[in-house]
């Protein structure tokens, strides 16, 4: 599917989609327990992959209107009867590979071509340290993966600068081992707010986990030396239900659209405070000069169009915001410098290179370095760009189309179903001229 975006103004009120990060963790947490009702989850390609994994390990999932009813495997996952296909979901693979280390037999996990190119070696090594069998079939640290146990817990050392999802998977599995897991970080943790999301979900399901060290910032996991989770714990949310909050990663495109092209104002509802690092999009827009207000009590963010100026911003903890910031920089005055972004190259695609390439196709000058992307603002041309089979690339380029000087066509735009299936419909509701099809 291609998407054709006509330069447009936007106006209106929309609701933030449910958080993909929280939904993944809630589905798996319910799987580790007796089960739970996950209320207001994100139903998307990625989260369905996690639901399939829970089913493969012996649980069940069933959609009931806007909720997901999960019956769990009560801390004892069964050996899957078939290969677990994680599709394009790196979160599913990393979280449920650790689950595989708890089975008596072996679990095999694979995914699409993009996922089979992403690094899993540090997680496999960590599971090996715990006594699991954990292998890449191609012996290159990439899927397909073979993993089995069953582990009792123990101590391990792992890098913190490749993916925080390794830590999440280990903590979630460690809570149902016999002796728990002690995690030592051998490098500084990147994407620390995502581990905070994990800690929040664990606590909501009655599971205690501890941060070792830390720098006493609002982000509990920032500067951590490691983590500890005791074994023998049970997953059980209060009243058997868990409510998924709104997704600030997805909100970033709506807020950017309002800052660049609001005729009057754009209001995003469902923006309640949580552990999500991507809530930083609000302060980033403020630093660029946006007219934006966040009523945290009501969970509503209001943004109006204004002239933006370039900024320097690090994305060590907010890698998913890089595409949005790059587009904002292209439309702003001056230079926008995005730093601490080497790990953003390890997502569904190399997002640093992809954004540099596609913005240049739209007439925007960029400089790309190993750990930095510089975008020179001043205007965006119309043209045809590639979506790189990456939902965040597609959605950010759609925002660019609002203020381009001609139509922007995004090839292979259907990957929005990974995190924001109704994205183009939501843009249309705000007044965007958008057509999708061949």
UniProtKB/Swiss-Prot annotation:
Pfam families: EPSP_synthase
Pathway: Metabolic intermediate biosynthesis; chorismate biosynthesis
SUPFAM superfamilies assigned: EPT/RTPC-like
UniProt: phosphoenolpyruvate binding residues: 20, 90, 118, 165, 351, 392
Keyword Transferase assigned: yes
InterPro entries noted in UniProt: Enolpyruvate_Tfrase_dom, Enolpyruvate_Tfrase_sf, EPSP_synthase, EPSP_synthase_CS, RNA3'P_cycl/enolpyr_Trfase_a/b
PROSITE patterns registered for this protein in UniProt: EPSP_SYNTHASE_1 (PS00104), EPSP_SYNTHASE_2 (PS00885)
Catalytic activity: 3-phosphoshikimate + phosphoenolpyruvate = 5-O-(1-carboxyvinyl)-3-phosphoshikimate + phosphate
Transmembrane feature ranges: none
One GO cellular component, as annotated: cytoplasm
Annotated localization: Cytoplasm
Family listed: Belongs to the EPSP synthase family.
Biological role: Catalyzes the transfer of the enolpyruvyl moiety of phosphoenolpyruvate (PEP) to the 5-hydroxyl of shikimate-3-phosphate (S3P) to produce enolpyruvyl shikimate-3-phosphate and inorganic phosphate.
Listed name of the protein: 3-phosphoshikimate 1-carboxyvinyltransferase
Organism name: Natronomonas pharaonis (strain ATCC 35678 / DSM 2160 / CIP 103997 / JCM 8858 / NBRC 14720 / NCIMB 2260 / Gabara)
């Amino acid at each position: 599917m291609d998407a054709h975006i006509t330069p447009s103004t936007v106006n209106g009120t929309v609701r933030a989609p449910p958080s993909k990060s929280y939904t993944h963790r809630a589905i798996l947490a319910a799987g580790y327990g007796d089960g739970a009702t996950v209320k207001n989850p994100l139903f998307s390609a990625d989260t369905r992959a996690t639901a399939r994994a829970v089913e493969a390990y012996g649980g069940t999932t069933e959609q009931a209107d806007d909720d997901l009813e999960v019956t769990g495997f009560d801390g004892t996952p069964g050996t899957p009867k078939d290969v677990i296909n994680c599709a394009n979901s790196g979160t599913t693979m990393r979280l449920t590979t650790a689950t595989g280390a708890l089975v008596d037999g072996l679990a095999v996990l694979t995914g699409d071509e993009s996922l089979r190119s992403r690094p899993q070696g540090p997680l496999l090594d960590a599971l090996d340290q715990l006594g699991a069998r954990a292998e890449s079939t191609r012996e290159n640290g990439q899927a397909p993966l073979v993993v089995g146990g069953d582990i009792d817990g123990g101590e391990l050392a792992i890098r913190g600068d490749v993916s925080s999802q390794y830590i999440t998977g280990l903590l979630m599995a460690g809570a149902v081992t016999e002796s728990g897991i002690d995690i030592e970080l051998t490098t500084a943790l990147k994407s620390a707010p995502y581990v905070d999301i994990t800690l929040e979900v664990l606590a909501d399901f009655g599971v205690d986990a501890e941060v070792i060290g830390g720098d006493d910032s609002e982000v509990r996991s920032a500067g951590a030396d490691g983590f500890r989770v005791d074994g023998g714990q049970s997953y059980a949310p209060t009243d058997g239900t868990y409510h998924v909050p709104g997704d600030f990663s997805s909100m970033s495109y709506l807020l950017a659209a309002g800052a660049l092209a609001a005729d009057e104002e754009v209001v995003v509802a469902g923006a309640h405070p949580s552990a999500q690092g991507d809530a930083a999009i609000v302060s980033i827009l403020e630093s660029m000069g946006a007219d934006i207000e966040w009523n945290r009590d009501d969970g509503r963010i209001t943004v109006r169009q204004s002239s933006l100026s370039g900024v320097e911003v690090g994305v060590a903890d907010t890698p998913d915001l890089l595409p949005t910031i790059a587009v904002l920089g292209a439309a702003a005055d001056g230079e926008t410098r995005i730093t601490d972004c080497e790990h953003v190259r390890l997502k569904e695609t190399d997002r640093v290179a992809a954004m540099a390439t596609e913005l240049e196709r739209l007439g925007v000058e960029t400089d790309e370095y190993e750990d930095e992307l510089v975008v020179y603002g001043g205007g965006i041309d119309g043209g045809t760009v590639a979506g790189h089979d990456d939902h965040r690339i597609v959605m950010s380029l759609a925002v660019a189309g609002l203020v381009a000087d001609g139509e922007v066509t995004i090839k292979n735009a259907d990957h929005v179903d990974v995190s924001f299936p109704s994205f183009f419909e939501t843009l249309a509701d705000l007044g965007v001229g958008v057509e999708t099809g061949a």
